[in-house]
Amino acid sequence: MTPTPTATLVARDWAEIQERMLVPLYEAVYDRLEVGPGDRLLGLDCGAGLALLLAAARGAAATGVEADPARRALARDRLLEVLAQPPAASSAARPYDALLAFSPAPETLAAALPAVRRGGAVVLADWGPAERCTVPSVPGGGPAPRDLDTVVERAGLRPDGSGRVFCPFGYADVDSAVRGLLSTGLYDGASDASLAEKELAEALHPFERPDGTVWLPNIFRYVIARVA
């Protein structure tokens, strides 16, 4: 499937503007798990693959799963191994030691779990408390934190800790902020995309600094669980 021009532009906005905003989250999780040489990591919905690159820099063997063809192509441009769907347990040379996912769909998580070894770590992340996140909501979209503990329970995993990470979103200007935030998919539910874009730009003005930059402090939460 060839990505549409719109999908390609949105994917590039994700890779060039937005993806790096989550680096503090990725690094905190890797520190907590002590990711290093010899570890095998599987990243669900890996986007353009920055989280995989950070794991690889620590010596881990990282594989991604990304359904969007445009983002998958960008990740492969970075010479990363990225699949269109979760690997079958029998296809891996050996099971993965850890799985990382940001608010995954239950069916995607369920499909990936068989590839993780028994006792392996499963890390799920999402937005923190609404009062600690400043990313705006507009009609049709915005941050909607999920109950990660319930996701863990329903997936049959064993809880093994949690944490919170400060992830500020900083942008060069309002236009960059709008493009970056739209690339997250948070606002895809808006019935009028152009109107949502205008409302988002308006909602960002209170966070605009005198030099024109935009600063959005946010807290993200992650939970660690183990495959039984």
What residue spans do the PLM features occupy?
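Conserved class I S-adenosyl-L-methionine
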Residues: 1-39, 50, 71-74
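A generic alpha-to-beta junction signature in SAM-dependent methyltransferases
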Residues: 33-35, 56, 109, 116-117, ...
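Class I SAM-dependent methyltransferase SAM/SAH-binding core
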Residues: 40-91
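Conserved Class I S-adenosyl-L-methionine
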Residues: 48-50, 151-228
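Conserved SAM-binding loop
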Residues: 64, 101, 124
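A short SAM/SAH-binding and catalytic strip from SAM-dependent methyltransferases
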Residues: 96-110, 128
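Conserved catalytic/acceptor-binding region of the Class I
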Residues: 111-172, 188-192
